[in-house]
Amino acid sequence: MTLNLDDFQKQDIKFDIAKLQQAYKEIVKTQKFEDAGVTNFGAISLTQIPGDPESIKGSKARGVFWTKPDQSGKEVSRDIDINEEAYSEFIKDYENTYFKEVYDKLSSKYKLGRVRILLKQPRSTLSWHRDPEPRLHIPIITNPGCIMVIDKVAQHMPADGSVWI
């Protein structure tokens, strides 16, 4: 088997990791992670559907994904469909953080939907799943044992301000 790292696409854009980490620390002082009823999962939404604060709560913090829950190997849909394009309003509580600058720069280059800070507890994993569209990832806090797996390739994405698809 030949390993193919093409699924890990480092983008030609980078942010100040110290500023990202400081903005994260500021937000978690006042905001609780929405767990959507899932163990070891947490999200703080930075965007919402304009004028709709309910659009970032419960299952809407996660949105639809596909998984293979049993030995049949068949994919099944989980959670609720989300109209990613509708999440176009940056939440006012976070406008004075570095995340707003990051959002503005990414918005000028990519078509964004929901933008979230995601939390994975130490020694926890997400089960295998497939998202409905490509996702941008910017690791903010991580360690060398933290890896992303795409197909059969595992890779560590360092917290250095890089943006990955």
Show the residue positions of the predicted features.
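A short beta-strand-loop-beta hairpin characteristic of the jelly-roll/cupin
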Residues: 139-160
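Short, conserved beta-strand element in jelly-roll/cupin
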Residues: 119, 130-146
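A short glycine-rich, His/Asp/Glu-containing loop-to-beta-strand
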Residues: 101-122
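Contiguous ligand/interfacial binding patches
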Residues: 163-165
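Non-heme Fe(II)/2-oxoglutarate
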Residues: 1-102
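Tight coil/turn sites that cap or link beta-strands
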Residues: 121-123, 160-161
